[in-house]
């Protein structure tokens, strides 16, 4: 990130002596590089034979990240970075809305990248209270928010996500778009299938609970519960967990 500081007429003679450490700026602009996220203070000092003056400006340094919300593509989802783990978009947290292809751009911060609600692009089904997430632990240019990253977000050892669900080790689930890459008849389709299965289970249980209790719970707790069962079984067997079995569902 660069801050352009335009030279201003100071009223001081240009031939005046400069204090040690000051750089003369006569015409044009000077680039100030922002390397640190958060507030950065820049000071412009004018110094000449008649005296001097300084002005400071505080500039927030931040990076954006692009991403996509995918079960199928989910449009019009509320996308936000949950920094305090209350699973709501607070006024001080970055938020945006996914476009018709599930894509978004958002200001990066560590926390949980959350997608809430929206519409399934293919079926035009409303996904009220569907919450999927991606735990943010470092900036990258692109993030995928999927049912699989939702399970990984709640795992004690997220590095086990591929082996626990039988996903090929070559796939980075945090940046891989399952919809754009499906149709290979192999490892990509398997990932897409696992995501769909997780969503169907979580969304169905959420809707049953909300209808019975007249509540508006999200799928967050169901993804947490699935994660606990997946990790428990994977720890006991050291083999990938089949989430299609009756034993897992019950």
What do the predicted segments below correspond to?
Residues 1-6, 66-70:
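Short edge beta-strand/loop segments characteristic of extracellular beta-sandwich folds
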Residues 20-26, 95-98:
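Short beta-strand segments within Ig-like beta-sandwich modules, predominantly Fibronectin type-III
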Residues 28-32, 104:
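Short strand-edge motifs at loop-to-beta-strand transitions and within beta-strands
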Residues 38-42, 111-112:
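Exposed beta-strand face motif in extracellular beta-rich ectodomains
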Residues 53-61:
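C-terminal edge beta-strand
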Residues 62-250:
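Feature for extracytoplasmic/surface-facing segments of secreted or surface-associated proteins
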């Amino acid at each position: 990130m660069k801050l352009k500081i335009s030279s201003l007429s100071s009223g001081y003679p240009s031939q005046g002596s400069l204090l040690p450490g000051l750089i003369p700026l006569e015409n044009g602009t000077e680039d100030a590089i922002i390397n640190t996220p958060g507030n950065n203070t820049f000071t412009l000092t004018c110094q000449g034979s008649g005296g001097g003056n300084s002005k400071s400006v505080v500039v927030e340094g931040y990076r954006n990240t692009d991403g996509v919300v995918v079960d199928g593509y989910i449009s019009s989802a509320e996308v936000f970075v949950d920094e305090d783990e209350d699973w709501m978009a607070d006024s001080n947290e970055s938020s945006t809305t996914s476009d018709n292809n599930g894509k978004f751009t958002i200001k990066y911060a560590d926390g949980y990248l959350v997608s809430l609600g929206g519409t399934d692009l293919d079926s035009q089904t409303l996904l009220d209270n569907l919450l999927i997430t991606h735990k943010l632990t470092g900036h990258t240019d692109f993030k995928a928010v999927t049912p699989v990253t939702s399970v990984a977000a709640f795992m004690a050892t997220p590095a086990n996500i591929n082996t626990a669900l039988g996903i090929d080790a070559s796939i980075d689930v945090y940046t891989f778009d399952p919809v754009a890459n499906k149709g290979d008849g192999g490892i990509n389709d398997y990932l897409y299938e696992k995501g769909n299965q997780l969503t169907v289970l979580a969304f169905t249980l959420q809707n049953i609970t909300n209808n019975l209790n007249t509540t508006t719970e999200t799928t967050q707790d169901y993804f947490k519960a699935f994660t606990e069962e997946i990790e428990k079984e994977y720890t006991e067997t050291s083999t990938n967990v089949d989430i299609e079995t009756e034993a897992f569902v019950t």
